[in-house]
């Protein structure tokens, strides 16, 4: 599944399903998931629920951080209702943690000094619900990227410390099976 901003259709958030055969790929029909301008789209797959989760900035709603669950059927995709995970401008990087079956969305929170922040969510049916956001970096950050490391069973977040000489920085964290809090937050290791 490829999610993108369609500049040819009012910058609407759009997704399309691709099917790989050998070294070729073919696509179904594009589907609009957000009928407003979007940006910073990030997609991950929840293998437990067999759903796609798309996180994005919704320019039609003050660039709020928003997520939506997609269900793939054949070469088509349908969507549930979009959910705001951050009521401020937030450029997301979405990953899936199979050990806790949670979606992790990392972002710089414009509503809180651009601090590095994580929203942890769980998919149920065609919807997603989020715990309270957790701040992992009390410094202004930007250009956040994230990936899940299977061997470490942890998420690695890379970002630029715009509030500290623009240093490239990485942070490693693990979700607890319950809500992420200062008590069960495991291991910050930073580089930069």
Where are the model-predicted features located?
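Extracellular receptor-binding modules and their adjoining Ser/Thr/Gly/Asp/Asn-rich linkers
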Residues: 4-6, 16-24, 39-51, 56-60, ...
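Hydrophobic, proline/glycine-rich low-complexity stretches
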Residues: 8-10, 26, 78, 111
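A short beta-strand motif characteristic of beta-propeller blades
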Residues: 28-33, 78-84, 131-136
């Amino acid at each position: 599944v490829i999610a993108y901003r369609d500049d040819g259709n009012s910058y609407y958030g759009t997704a399309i399903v691709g099917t790989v055969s050998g070294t070729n790929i073919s696509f179904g029909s594009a589907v609009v998931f957000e009928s407003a301008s979007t940006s910073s789209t990030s997609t991950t797959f929840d293998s437990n629920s067999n759903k796609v989760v798309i996180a994005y900035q919704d320019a039609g709603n003050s660039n709020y951080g928003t997520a939506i669950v997609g269900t793939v059927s054949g070469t088509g995709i349908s969507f549930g209702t979009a959910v705001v995970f951050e009521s401020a401008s937030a450029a997301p990087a979405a990953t899936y943690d199979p050990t806790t079956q949670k979606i992790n969305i990392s972002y710089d929170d414009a509503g809180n000094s651009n601090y590095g922040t994580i929203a942890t969510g769980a998919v149920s049916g065609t919807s997603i619900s989020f715990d309270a956001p957790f701040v992992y970096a009390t410094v202004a950050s930007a250009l956040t990227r994230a990936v899940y490391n299977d061997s470490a069973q942890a998420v690695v977040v890379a970002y630029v410390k715009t509030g500290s000489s623009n240093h490239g920085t990485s942070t490693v964290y693990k979700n607890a099976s319950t809500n992420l809090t200062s008590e069960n937050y495991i291991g910050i290791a930073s580089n930069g």
